[in-house]
């Protein structure tokens, strides 16, 4: 019998995750848990005597949940983890805060350096985890430190150097949940910041299929190369498997055309990797995460 820790937050069993993802595919979470606050999360982790497998879930913007669902507990940090506050000339931001919301907050408060976030879907926690970046900036450029908790329930702090930011990755321990990020503040001009944000939004809408069911960039760019160019060169623009296709508009974006399964999407991505490797000798690395069980 499955015995769950006593918590103040909310449990849901056999919870459908499909509606939480941008691709709108995938199976159910065996257990879905939204902690009330960081102390509630700590209590859950300490009590997790059965050592149930744990996965964390953000905005669902760059993830494929496999059709067999996710075993164990999926933890989603809700609105109580999305606060933005000023402390000693720094911003402390909850990990579930959306990148877009932080960009808007910074513009309203004449804080520069965060404009690029308006073009990156997802949460602050996810952005830190993958060192998300666009339009010449990355999270490594603005993060001072993060506050996190490990799966044993220990609160930890990591500086920018300790995080070890790399291209779309970092050196943080795997069994870690990011709670907050601390950012440095550089004052700017609100109107100029808004102009830059609008430039980024316009550039994004003119080059990316933002109105489709997509998960953002499918593959990370190899050093000195562009993934979309390699995909295009291999003749895979618009290529389709089942209900999934590579976008005609931007061929490093995978799209659910309405009836795709998670398997369709993952099979398509793996096929593209194989064909690009055969054509160009380059092995593309997934930027979209794939988690869960195959059916």
Curated annotation (Swiss-Prot):
Its cofactor is FAD. It catalyses: UDP-N-acetyl-alpha-D-muramate + NADP(+) = UDP-N-acetyl-3-O-(1-carboxyvinyl)-alpha-D-glucosamine + NADPH + H(+). It is an enzyme of class 1 (oxidoreductase). Disulfide bonds: none annotated. GO terms for molecular function: FAD binding; UDP-N-acetylmuramate dehydrogenase activity. The active site is at residues 168, 217, 287. The keyword Ribonucleoprotein does not apply. Its EC number is 1.3.1.98. One of its GO terms (biological process) is peptidoglycan biosynthetic process. The keyword Cell cycle applies. It is found in: Cytoplasm. Cell wall formation. NCBIfam families: murB (TIGR00179), PRK13905.1 (NF010480). HAMAP family: MurB. This is UDP-N-acetylenolpyruvoylglucosamine reductase. It comes from Rickettsia conorii (strain ATCC VR-613 / Malish 7).
